[in-house]
C-alpha cells in the first residue's frame, strides 16, 4: 500500500461499529415544517437503552447501516439522516416507548406512497435490537401532500354526482361472497337497489373466478343498476371490484366499467398495492369514476398493539394514494374498532385539519390543504338495531353498509333493503328534530317499525344479536 493511500485512509474515516445514538439521537433538534414526522411504539430488547433503540429506528429507516462505511464521506448525513428527537415512556408499560423521528423531505420520491413506506416501514421492522416496533402515526407535511392527487373526487363531488344530501349513504355487500353465477348476482344487486339502498358491493375477494368472470358480473350489475334507477328515480351504484393480478388488467376492468356508464369501481388497496391503487385513482379522476376502497389484509398489519402499523397511518396513506370511500370499522359491529380511536382516524379521513389529540390516538396535527376528503364506510356485523348508534357516531358523511343485515331479512333482499332505508330515514328525522339517538335509539326504531312491516320483521330477527368482545388495540392508560 502506498504512503498516499495510507494517509487518505487515516483522515475522516474509522472503520468499525459505533452506537446509533451518537449520530441519530438528537433531542435538541427542532423539526422543520417540511419534515415527515413519525411516532413509533418501540419495545427494545432487554438491556438496550431507549435512546439507542430510537436512534436505531431513525438510522435504519433512513441513511444508516450496521457499520461505518467509506461512502458516508461522499454525502451530507446531516442533510439526509432521520433523527430521533423525542422519546416518551408509554404509560403502564415497563419497557416501551414512543419515539418521535423526523425525516428530511428529500429522502422521498414525490407522489409515491410506495417509496415513503419502503423507507419508514421497511427493513427496520426486522431489526434484532427491537423486540417489537409499531408505527403509530405520521405527520405528512403540506409540501409533500401537494405532490399527490389524492382522492379522485371527494365527499362533496360524490354527493353532487349522486344528488344525495343530508344523510349517510346506504350500502350492502352481496352474499354469499363467492359461488353465485353472474346472473344471480345481478339479480341480488337489483333487489337491494330497488328496495332503497344507494349502493351494493362486490366483496373483497370477488375478482374473476371460474364461477363468475368479471366481464359477466359487470354486465349483469350494470343492467341491475339501470333497472333500479328507472324504478326508483334515484341514482344507484355497485362497487365493481377492478382488483386484478396485474395493473394492466385492473385498468382494463375500470375502462369497461366506464364504458358501461356505471358511477363507481372498487379496489383492494393493500393486497393490490399502493402503486396500483394510485394508478387507478388517477384513471378514476380523469374518467369521472368514483373509487371505493376495501382494506382487506389490514388486520395483519394493524391489529396487534405492539407491532406493525396503526390503521390511522394506512388511512392517511390512502388519502394520499387516492380513494373516495374506505372501510373504517363500525365500533358496534363484529369487527375490531374502539370508539375514540375509530373517530380519530375517521376525522383524519374527512377533515381538512385535525389537531393533535392523545385521547383519540392522534399524535400529530395534520393539515390536508386542498386534498379532498374520504367517506368512511361502516361495515361488518351491523343491522337495523345498530342504525341509531351508527348515525350518531359517523354522522352524515359516511356509508353504512349492511350485508347480512340486508340479505338475511326473512322476506328477502328487497324487504331487507327497505328495512334499512326506513330505519335510516327514521334516525335522521329524529336527529333533525333534536332527539338523542344514543339514549332514544331503540325507541325510535320501534316507533318506525309500526309503519313498516319490513322493519318490524328485521327487528324481530336481530333483536338478540350482539358482538360483545373487547378491542385488542386500545388507547394507552396508566395501570391503576
From Swiss-Prot:
Mind telling me which GO cellular component terms the entry cites? Answer: chloroplast
Q: Write down how the cofactor binds this protein.
A: Binds 1 Mg(2+) ion per subunit.
Which sites are catalytic? Answer: 175 (proton acceptor), 294 (proton acceptor)
Kindly list the positions at which N-acetylproline occurs in this protein. 3
Instruction: PTM N6,N6,N6-trimethyllysine: list the residues.
Output: 14
Primary localization: plastid
Provide the site residues for: Transition state stabilizer: 334
Cofactors required: Mg(2+)
Taxonomy, superkingdom:
Eukaryota
- According to the UniProt entry, what is the EC number of this protein? 4.1.1.39
Pfam families linked to this entry: RuBisCO_large (PF00016), RuBisCO_large_N (PF02788)
Q: Where in the cell is it found?
A: Plastid, Chloroplast
Give the reactions, separated by semicolons, that this protein catalyses: 2 (2R)-3-phosphoglycerate + 2 H(+) = D-ribulose 1,5-bisphosphate + CO2 + H2O; D-ribulose 1,5-bisphosphate + O2 = 2-phosphoglycolate + (2R)-3-phosphoglycerate + 2 H(+)
Known post-translational modifications?
A: The disulfide bond which can form in the large chain dimeric partners within the hexadecamer appears to be associated with oxidative stress and protein turnover.
Q: Which HAMAP family match?
A: RuBisCO_L_type1 (MF_01338)
Stated role: RuBisCO catalyzes two reactions: the carboxylation of D-ribulose 1,5-bisphosphate, the primary event in carbon dioxide fixation, as well as the oxidative fragmentation of the pentose substrate in the photorespiration process. Both reactions occur simultaneously and in competition at the same active site.
Q: How does it assemble?
A: Heterohexadecamer of 8 large chains and 8 small chains; disulfide-linked. The disulfide link is formed within the large subunit homodimers.
Q: What is this protein called?
A: Ribulose bisphosphate carboxylase large chain
Q: Which organism is it from?
A: Alluaudia procera
Q: Which gene encodes it?
A: rbcL
